[in-house]
Amino acid sequence: MMSKTYHIAVLPGDGIGPEVMAQAYKILDAVRQRFNVRISTSEYDVGGAAIDRQGSPLPAGTVAGCEQADAILFGSVGGPKWEHLPAAEQPERGALLPLRKHFKLFSNLRPSRLYPGLEAYCPLRANIAERGFDILCVRELTGGIYFGQPKGREGTGPHEHAFDTEVYYRFEIERIARIAFESARKRRGKVTSIDKANVLQSSILWRKVVSQVAPDYPDVALSHLYIDNATMQLIKDPSQFDVMLCSNLFGDILSDECAMITGSMGMLPSASLNEQGFGMYEPAGGSAPDIAGKDIANPVAQILSASLLLRYSLGLDDAADAIELAVNQALEAGHRTADLAGGGSAVGTGEMGDIIAALISQGA
């Protein structure tokens, strides 16, 4: 009986996207060989590159290719070249948001960790940074105040006003809570749910539903924090957190705060999943057109995005572990791209990919 072949739709995009994606290909090759798994990839245009070649940021052929795949590995989109276009036709609005909507990607997972040896890049005090941290921010992506109706602006003069509506349904809260609890089971067994239940009706329901889901996961400890306290605690002692469960708005804020305290955005991957486990995986940073093509971009976020893909959509935990271990070992050996070299000697984008791929192949 032949082993299953996994199909990945690869969307390199713009800016540094293609060159960091090239390093992800090296990592997938190493995984194929070491773990004897069958992984095929098909590449499609997206973003500005798709506008230039096909006249649309998200061509129908790209969507069709993604529909045939088990997961999407996404690079980055956008750049000054396309900023003159109407907002809905620009790479970000015209590609990322429609992909999320089309595949019903309701959950966003953003890991943020401080890697050993990179404490100097953390903006927190040394006595806080030295404790390290490894946080997974689980954000609800399709509900809440960004999508609630009604929203709009009315009136003129002193009576001109604007309004947005925060709406959460029980099923939306329950399904994102289960993602957080399941994730905590694979980590350190702690979920901190973030809300504003002392003021907001939507947060009162959020806390109620999360608390009702918790007994299904007796091996996971649940605690609750108000959003204002959570932002303070994240600065005071990030090591206390494992999985942070957030609504759309609160997760938007906290996931960026988590990213910033690592001091190394080029290291951070993200995953967006639907209820079937289908996902889109991408670096948390942008397309960085100013450094594109110079072999100086940090490919680790793209490589770790591939690791998340293997773990969450393909169920290949051993391969994902091997990638993460190889990244750790490369950093511990002192290999740094320019963003982390601090003026010292730096390796290029391609060399960093080669180093990590070799560590995977060697058994890391």
Curated annotation (Swiss-Prot):
> Its family?
Belongs to the isocitrate and isopropylmalate dehydrogenases family. LeuB type 1 subfamily.
Report the pathway entry.
Answer: Amino-acid biosynthesis; L-leucine biosynthesis; L-leucine from 3-methyl-2-oxobutanoate: step 3/4
Self-association and partners? Homodimer.
HAMAP family per UniProt: LeuB_type1
Q: What does this protein do?
A: Catalyzes the oxidation of 3-carboxy-2-hydroxy-4-methylpentanoate (3-isopropylmalate) to 3-carboxy-4-methyl-2-oxopentanoate. The product decarboxylates to 4-methyl-2 oxopentanoate.
For this entry, the protein name equals 3-isopropylmalate dehydrogenase
Extract the GO molecular function terms from the UniProt entry: 3-isopropylmalate dehydrogenase activity; magnesium ion binding; NAD binding
Q: Where in the cell is it found?
A: Cytoplasm
Q: What is the catalytic activity of this protein?
A: (2R,3S)-3-isopropylmalate + NAD(+) = 4-methyl-2-oxopentanoate + CO2 + NADH
Q: How is the cofactor bound?
A: Binds 1 Mg(2+) or Mn(2+) ion per subunit.
Query: What do the Gene Ontology cellular component annotations say?
Result: cytosol
Q: Where is this site: Important for catalysis?
A: Y146, K196
